[in-house]
């Protein structure tokens, strides 16, 4: 096949000459048309070609007609307008080269009958399974003043306890809490952190497929934000119950779920039947007459009774399934082909079963131990085989044949099981019965009998003649059947060789003739690549009436070897170019050119009409009935035998091979996509913790030798520590809570500085009032058991804040407030005019100390009396000595307090 530019060399699956073509093959051909020139032909039937610059007189004022080529409906079914050009097919086929024909042996016996061929069932056992689990979603967040930050989450799947599974299967509900015991500690998680254990209804999930139904309690996970400047971790709980399909493959020692979960337990294990069990037995439970809901999402609570229900507990899921009897739900063999007419030939060591419709011979070794099939081996398909044999017999053989014995079961060398039901013609069956009865009557009695009549003797001779006739007929029939079978086998072998060689010349025509439909074929090495042709829109095919090609300036460039056609694909209005091929095939492209001949005459067939071209220009239409046919068919006087078409044997179809694997990729990807859609993705940034400066310093130090490397490590360690410390500070400050603490600390420091500054300023301005507040107050003293109230007024018109008078001097304006003038205290007795000595100073300090102790006691007493008042609290006033020793932290005394000396 000639390759065409633009064809994508990709193999497209699921396309064969017998099956349905997928859209992928259409896409393949659309890729071919991408390089085709898209034109819009004129809608008129006749087009006048102008002369232009061409000097050929034959082109002047020539009327060229574009022909609408229609195909008759009878021919359209076999050879419609189609495209068969492709670089690579989708199926690979080859001719059988190892056909073995056993020569006829007159001593072998051949018989005809009905043959059923059973193959091993590779499809897995499919059953309903349930999974029970809870999804715990823990979400950590931080609440700021105006924003709520989601910091992360963790998802965990846990198995439901068995007591809660009973609630799910009976009520369609599950609880909003989950308890886990780790060591001696018990942990309980609640849905939405509400600290209440309630029940939630199951409902159908939106995501699912035909084989998997998922029931959940929560469609969207909720999250409760925390308080301002605090972290909070919330829990959202979702019960997930899945009704899906489990698959187990022969020998049924494990099964697989669509989610990829593998359980190493036979689905038929019931606890005592000896089936495979490779899991923890304490986690396995089985119940009889178990009640389970048909639909967990329905409030109708319609249940069904399961004879045996098994559950297996795992850490993250509980798996349940119905336990059935293996002999009732599975069969190791499955019917492959039914051969209505077959021939079995018996040889010395084997039986050969010839299936004419399959063009195959199946061999059974007589002495192979594998041929001994037990009743248990055929139990699962014995009844079906008997019904099928009776159906074929009543349809095709009831009037002319009888069954020869019962059906027998045989195993071929390829592992197939053949059910053989021998047939015998009714006339031969009657002769055989008569011969057997004659033999029985001849040997049935040894007693002496009365001489028979002459006609009885004649009857004995006729029985012998019948027996001889039967034996002779059987021999001739067996010989005829043997020769026919051998000749038929040799003919098929030679035909296969001839077709194999012819396919190297034109594989498309040979394969089209074999399969009876137009196909595109190409020899690829020692095999043939096969694909089906694509039909175009039959009503849009238009043949160009001119096979000459001119340049833009009107010069003749050459001539097309095949007529140019316009066409459109189905369900498309885009017009494309091609060339007309044999049997209505459209060849893609217009590159098939040749040198123009002067006296050219050609006829091209499209449909049931011939189109005549002279000098590469269409002249007229020709009826094909006017052209004689070369008849190569030699008609037989007898009825011809049925034609035998080659058939590609497929022991297992593509669907069976796809379903044979327990790991269904499509189901696994659906389950994966379901889980993926439910995930919340968090983007993380990866930051290099090493600063670029330290990294450059380390590289520089490494170049200075061992000493530099050591210094670099020390500097790097110190720099790393400093960087970590600074990073910690930056992290603390950038944290909202840390920033608030720093702000409060700064405000406190500023307040403390202002307070200290004001105290120091007041002490500097009035130090005597600050350190000795008692001096500016009214003094009450007791001297010599006499109470004298002394006031120290200042000059007239001034306040009484003046200091006491010096000894020996009468203060101006002072007067005795408690006694008469005669009894006034004389200042001379106190040593008027003399300075205070050290002893006087000591007595004054002692007096101040006694005054300080007295005031302190009064303050303590006053504090105890006012402790009952909750609205005010008076702090203990420090004494004078304390003020002198610790001048900081003084508090100003009240003006109404008295000082007693």
Curated annotation (Swiss-Prot):
Placement of sequence motif Internalization motif: 890-893
Membrane side Virion surface: residue ranges: 35-736
Disulfide bonds: 84-533, 101-489, 174-239, 331-380, 559-596
Key words of the record: Disulfide bond, Glycoprotein, Host cell membrane, Host endosome, Host Golgi apparatus, Host membrane, Host-virus interaction, Membrane, Signal, Transmembrane, Transmembrane helix, Viral attachment to host cell, Viral envelope protein, Virion, Virus entry into host cell
Annotated transmembrane regions: 737-757
Membrane topology: Single-pass type I membrane protein
Annotated segments matching region Disordered: 794-813, 852-901
One cellular component term from this protein's GO annotations in UniProt: viral envelope
Subcellular location: Virion membrane; Host cell membrane; Host endosome membrane; Host Golgi apparatus membrane
Principal location listed in the UniProt entry: virion
Entry protein name: Envelope glycoprotein B
Annotated source species: Guinea pig cytomegalovirus (strain 22122) (GPCMV)
Lineage start: Viruses, Duplodnaviria, Heunggongvirae, Peploviricota, Herviviricetes
């Amino acid at each position: 096949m000639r390759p065409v530019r633009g064809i994508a060399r990709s193999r497209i699956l699921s396309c064969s000459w017998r099956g349905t073509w997928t859209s992928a093959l259409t896409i393949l051909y659309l890729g071919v048309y991408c390089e085709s020139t898209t034109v819009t032909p004129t809608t008129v039937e006749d087009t006048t070609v102008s002369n232009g610059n061409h000097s050929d007189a034959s082109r002047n004022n020539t009327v060229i007609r574009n022909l609408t080529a229609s195909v008759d409906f009878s021919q359209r079914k076999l050879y419609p307008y189609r495209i068969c050009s492709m670089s690579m097919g989708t199926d690979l086929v080859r001719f059988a080269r190892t056909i073995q024909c056993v020569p006829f042996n007159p001593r072998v016996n051949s018989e005809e009958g009905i043959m059923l061929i059973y193959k091993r069932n590779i499809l897995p056992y499919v059953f309903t399974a349930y999974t029970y689990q809870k999804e715990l979603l823990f979400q950590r967040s931080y609440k700021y003043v105006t924003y709520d930050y989601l910091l992360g989450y963790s998802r965990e799947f846990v198995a439901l306890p068995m007591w809660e599974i009973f609630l799910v299967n009976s009520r369609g509900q599950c609880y909003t809490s989950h308890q886990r015991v780790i060591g001696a500690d018990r942990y309980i998680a609640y849905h939405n952190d509400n600290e209440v254990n309630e029940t939630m209804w199951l409902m159908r999930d939106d995501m699912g497929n035909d084989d998997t139904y998922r029931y959940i309690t929560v469609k969207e996970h909720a999250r409760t934000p925390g308080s301002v400047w605090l972290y909070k971790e919330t829990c959202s709980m979702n019960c997930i119950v899945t009704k899906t399909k489990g698959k187990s493959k022969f020998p049924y020692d494990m099964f697989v779920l669509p989610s990829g979960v593998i359980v190493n337990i036979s689905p038929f294990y019931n606890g005592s039947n000896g089936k495979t069990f490779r899991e923890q037995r304490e986690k396995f439970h089985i119940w009889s007459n178990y009640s389970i809901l048909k639909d967990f999402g329905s409030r109708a609570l319609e249940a069904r009774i399961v004879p045996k229900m098994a559950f297996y507990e795992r850490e993250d899921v509980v798996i349940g399934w119905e336990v059935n009897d293996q002999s009732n739900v599975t069969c190791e063999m499955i019917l492959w082909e039914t051969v209505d007419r077959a021939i079995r030939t018996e040889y010395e060591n084997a039986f050969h079963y010839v299936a004419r419709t399959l063009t195959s011979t199946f061999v059974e070794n007589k002495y192979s131990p594998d041929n001994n099939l037990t009743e248990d081996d055929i139990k699962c398909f014995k009844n079906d085989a008997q019904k099928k044999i009776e159906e074929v017999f009543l349809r095709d053989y009831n009037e002319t044949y009888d069954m020869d014995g019962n059906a027998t079961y045989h195993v071929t060398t390829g592992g197939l099981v053949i059910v053989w039901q021998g047939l015998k013609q009714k006339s031969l069956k009657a002769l055989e019965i008569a011969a057997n009865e004659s033999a029985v009557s001849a040997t049935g009695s040894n007693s002496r009998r009365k001489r028979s009549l002459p006609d009885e003797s004649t009857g004995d001779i006729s029985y012998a003649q019948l027996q001889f006739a039967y034996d002779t007929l059987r021999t001739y029939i067996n010989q005829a059947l043997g020769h026919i079978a051998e000749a038929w086998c040799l003919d098929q072998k030679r035909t296969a060789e001839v077709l194999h060689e012819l396919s190297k010349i034109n594989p498309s025509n040979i394969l089209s003739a074999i399969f009876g439909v137009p196909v595109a074929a190409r020899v690829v090495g020692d095999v043939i690549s096969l694909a089906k042709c694509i039909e175009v829109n039959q009503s849009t095919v238009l043949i160009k009436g001119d096979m000459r090609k001119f340049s833009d300036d009107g010069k003749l460039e050459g001539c097309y070897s095949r007529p140019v056609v316009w066409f459109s694909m189905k369900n498309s209005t885009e017009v494309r170019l091609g060339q007309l091929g044999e049997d209505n095939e459209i060849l893609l492209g217009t590159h098939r050119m040749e040198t123009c001949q002067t006296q050219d005459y050609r006829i091209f067939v499209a449909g049931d009409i011939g189109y005549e071209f002279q000098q590469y220009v269409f002249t007229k239409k020709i009826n094909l009935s006017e052209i004689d046919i070369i008849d190569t068919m030699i008609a037989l006087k007898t009825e011809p035998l049925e034609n035998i078409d080659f058939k590609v044997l497929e022991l297992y179809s593509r669907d069976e091979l796809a379903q044979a694997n327990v790991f269904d990729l499509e189901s696994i990807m659906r389950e994966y996509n379901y889980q993926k859609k439910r995930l919340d993705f968090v983007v993380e940034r990866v930051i290099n913790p090493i600063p670029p400066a330290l990294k450059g310093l380390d590289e520089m130090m490494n170049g200075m030798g061992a000493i530099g490397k050591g210094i670099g490590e020390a500097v790097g360690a110190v720099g790393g520590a400093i960087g970590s410390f600074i990073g910690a500070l930056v992290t603390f400050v950038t944290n909202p809570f840390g920033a608030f603490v720093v702000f409060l600390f700064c405000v406190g420091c500023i307040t403390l500085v202002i307070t200290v500054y004001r105290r120091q300023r007041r002490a500097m301005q009035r130090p005597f009032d600050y350190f000795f507040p008692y001096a500016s107050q009214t003094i009450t003293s007791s001297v010599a058991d006499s109470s004298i109230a002394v006031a120290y007024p200042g000059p007239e018109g001034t306040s009484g804040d003046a200091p006491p008078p010096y000894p020996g001097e009468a203060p101006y304006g002072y007067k005795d407030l408690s006694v008469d003038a005669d009894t006034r205290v004389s200042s001379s007795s106190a040593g008027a005019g003399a300075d205070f000595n050290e002893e006087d100073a000591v007595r004054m300090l002692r007096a101040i100390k006694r005054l300080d102790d007295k005031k302190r006691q009064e303050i303590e007493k006053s504090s105890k009396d006012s402790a009952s008042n909750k609205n005010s609290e008076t702090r203990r006033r420090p004494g004078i000595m304390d003020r002198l020793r610790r001048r900081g932290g003084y508090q100003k005394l009240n003006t109404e307090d008295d000082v007693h000396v």
